[in-house]
């Protein structure tokens, strides 16, 4: 079995509670796999930093039920425990579609118990009414217990525990307000773990918090994985000839879905990570520039001459480059930071990136208007947007037509650049197309030059 950590709403402390659970299990030398419901990148990076293994996203909009079931069972093989962190409130799904793609949807699909994290601050016995509603709203979702968070005092804890037990639920942990470990936030959520120099100390604090705050006699049987039947295949990925593909990974570029990287490897890609912030540019036959926060280190990045020369040269030669969000932001002529400073960037696209205050957020259905190194014109895909920047001017021949009547994305030869984050789990053809384009460079030593 495994457990799903959920809550009535966002902001209750799900991530901190999840990390504390993972840190305790890791400290006790258990092989633990973590998962995250939804499209988020930052929480999974914290999970991975604690467990030492990639965290896997379970997203029923970006993929589908058979894939989520298959990837869950695949990644549980050889593990001793598993913890899934939910997203938003337990029943919060895609806007306008009820609880579709919600944490509850995943719980029903995988038939896993839910532990509800309750924010006790400012509440007393009224918590019983909250639990009454959540327990009965959908009987197919089994709430196995409650962890109380941000509790004010022992007297407060007693009142809240009475509320929990009045609903026939197990109290699995109590975290007091003065013990809460706060993780730093900024404009798009948590500050990524790569930027926290003392996270190892934080991890130790989280493990200690879990040890003294949680009822492990009750929790351990819930998180322990039982042997299951062989997992169904996640995708049809007949290997292609090997080809070296470079993946940018540092403080500027770090947003990648674990399953996407594993799919590329299954197709024959030999993935090599590199750091643009260190001025690195490996000689490979394809490049991934993922999302991240290039705006926060734009000045440092702008000075990396070797990286820019390598990037411009590769695109000019037609080497496939797949850039998402943060990767797109650095391809224009300049990037204007939140403080208003403008820094020269690649100059590959005739546009510049401007940081704003409006967050563009949500799932999208996208139809490709033009072919790129990863998509064919006319193909429809599902993706996710999450950014506060904009590229101006907009492309004359955009890559995507989105279902909100917006158009976006750039395509030039073998360059694919877009704000849209894609999960290739049920769209393996896109990854295969990208690898084939990279192989064309490897075998022929050339490809179609990009024209601007």
UniProtKB/Swiss-Prot annotation:
The record marks 421 as: Increases nucleophilicity of active site Cys. It is an enzyme of class 6 (ligase). Keywords: ATP-binding, Cobalamin biosynthesis, Glutamine amidotransferase, Ligase, Magnesium, Nucleotide-binding. Pathway: Cofactor biosynthesis; adenosylcobalamin biosynthesis; cob(II)yrinate a,c-diamide from sirohydrochlorin (anaerobic route): step 10/10. Its cofactor is Mg(2+). The keyword Disulfide bond does not apply. The active site is at 325 (nucleophile). InterPro entries: CbiA/CobB_synth (IPR004484), Class_I_gatase-like (IPR029062), CobQ/CobB/MinD/ParA_Nub-bd_dom (IPR002586), GATase_3 (IPR011698), P-loop_NTPase (IPR027417). It catalyses: cob(II)yrinate + 2 L-glutamine + 2 ATP + 2 H2O = cob(II)yrinate a,c diamide + 2 L-glutamate + 2 ADP + 2 phosphate + 2 H(+). GO terms for biological process: cobalamin biosynthetic process. Residues 244-429 form the GATase cobBQ-type domain. This is Cobyrinate a,c-diamide synthase. It comes from Gloeobacter violaceus (strain ATCC 29082 / PCC 7421). The lineage of its organism: Bacteria, Bacillati, Cyanobacteriota, Cyanophyceae, Gloeobacterales. The gene is cbiA.
């Amino acid at each position: 079995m495994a457990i799903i950590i959920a809550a009535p709403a966002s902001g209750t402390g799900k991530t901190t509670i999840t990390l504390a659970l993972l840190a305790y299990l890791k400290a006790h030398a258990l092989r633990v796999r973590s998962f995250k419901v939804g499209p988020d990148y930052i929480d999974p990076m914290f999970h991975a930093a604690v467990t030492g293994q990639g965290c896997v996203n379970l997203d029923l909009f970006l993929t589908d039920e058979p894939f989520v079931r298959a990837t869950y069972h695949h990644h549980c093989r050889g593990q001793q425990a598993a913890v899934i962190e939910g997203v938003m409130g337990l029943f919060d799904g895609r806007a306008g579609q009820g609880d579709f793609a919600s944490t509850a949807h995943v719980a029903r699909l995988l038939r896993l118990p839910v532990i509800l994290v309750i924010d006790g601050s400012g509440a007393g016995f009224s918590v019983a009414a909250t639990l009454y509603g959540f327990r009965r709203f959908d009987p197919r979702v089994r709430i196995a217990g409650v962890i109380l968070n941000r509790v004010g005092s022992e007297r407060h804890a007693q009142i809240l525990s009475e509320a929990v037990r009045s609903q026939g639920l197990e109290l699995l942990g109590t975290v007091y307000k003065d013990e809460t470990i706060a993780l730093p936030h900024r404009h798009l959520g948590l500050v990524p773990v790569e930027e926290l120099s003392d996270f190892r100390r934080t991890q130790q604090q989280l493990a200690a918090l879990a040890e003294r705050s949680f009822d492990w006699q009750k929790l351990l049987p819930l998180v322990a994985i039982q042997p299951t039947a062989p997992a169904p295949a996640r995708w049809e990925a007949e290997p292609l000839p090997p080809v070296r593909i470079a993946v940018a990974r540092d403080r500027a570029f770090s947003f990648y879905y674990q399953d996407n990287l594993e799919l590329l490897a299954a197709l024959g890609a030999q993935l090599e990570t590199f750091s643009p912030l260190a001025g690195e540019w490996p000689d490979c036959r394809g490049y991934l520039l993922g999302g991240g926060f290039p705006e926060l280190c734009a000045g440092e990045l702008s000075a990396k001459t070797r990286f820019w020369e390598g990037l411009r040269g590769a695109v000019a030669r037609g080497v496939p480059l797949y850039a998402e969000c943060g990767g797109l932001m650095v391809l224009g002529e300049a990037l204007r930071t939140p403080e208003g400073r403008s820094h020269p960037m690649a100059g590959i696209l005739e546009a510049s990136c401007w940081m704003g205050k409006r967050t563009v957020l949500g799932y999208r259905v996208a139809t490709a208007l033009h072919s790129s190194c990863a998509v064919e014109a006319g193909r429809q895909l599902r993706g996710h947007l999450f950014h506060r920047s904009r590229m101006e001017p907009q492309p004359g021949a955009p890559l995507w037509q989105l279902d909100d009547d917006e158009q976006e994305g750039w395509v030039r030869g073998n360059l694919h650049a877009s704000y849209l984050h894609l999960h290739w789990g049920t769209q393996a053809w896109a990854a295969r197309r990208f690898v084939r384009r990279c192989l064309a460079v490897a075998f022929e030593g050339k490809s179609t030059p990009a024209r601007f």
